[in-house]
Amino acid sequence: MTGLAVLGGFVLDTLFGDPAWLPHPVVLMGKAISALEKRLRARLPKTPQGELLGGGIVAFCLPVGTFVCTGLVCLGAARLSPWLGLAVQMFWCGQALAAKGLAQESMNVHKELVKGDLPAARKAVSRIVGRDTQDLTAEGVTKAAVETVAENASDGVIAPLLYMLIGGAPLALTYKAINTMDSMLDYKNEKYLYFGRIPAKLDDAANYLPSRLAGLLWCAAAALTGNSAKGAWRIWRRDRRNHASPNSAQTESACAGALGVQLAGPAYYFGEYYPKPTIGDALRPIEPEDIRRANKMMYAESLLALLLGLAIRGVIL
């Protein structure tokens, strides 16, 4: 029933997203990471070796704990009733996907940009990006929103979809645990330089194949949505390594090529300037409507991934 649970979860996310009133596993994961970090920092030596060990313990405990706990719940529910087991898996599969939430948040940015309210647009984009937004121009806000749609299409949709097709909701939520660790601990500053290193490497490994699949699917999605598949393919091949992370530029490069715009480049994080290479060619100025176009491609590649995954699962399993 895993295929049915994945399909149902995809539909649930598409229709409802993540309602604010509904408890989300990622919130619990975040609290667990913070609690573990606090305890480990208090007990381990404040040395590079001690911090590496602490990060390694978090990187082991959280994914393993997530898989065991969710697996036991799914197993227990299925023993009570196969339909209850399916419902639990379907619900968690929906929570592991983030397409609807990503589209909603990025389109909030689009709405404020179209209204011409730059301060409101900066505030809206600050909810979905990690960079400093208080001094961004309208073009900078638009770029940030498009980039986050492209990047999160991989780790917010394609990667969890791939893992749930392989191992159901428990494996998808285990991936979300790894991704949440990376979001909270992977900072190149004094506090997390060593503590966040092992969680970051684990996230790189977990995203290696999904991100490349997402980049290829984005090229196909560009053709389906009336954007430039040729440009997506060309820039993906050229610029997919233009990022400190081995995975982040996979979908960003395909998106930039599909739209004919330039993404990435230098940015400020916590008041510090970070020089970063650009992605894509500025064949035209970026515009707010590119946020909508990016979301259309994100949904198209998500549907392609779902159909392809279900077809392969049906043949193999």
Residue ranges, per PLM feature:
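Glycine-rich phosphate/dinucleotide-binding loop and adjoining beta-alpha-beta core of small-molecule
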Residues: 183
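Hydrophobic alpha-helical transmembrane segments
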Residues: 1-174, 178, 186-317
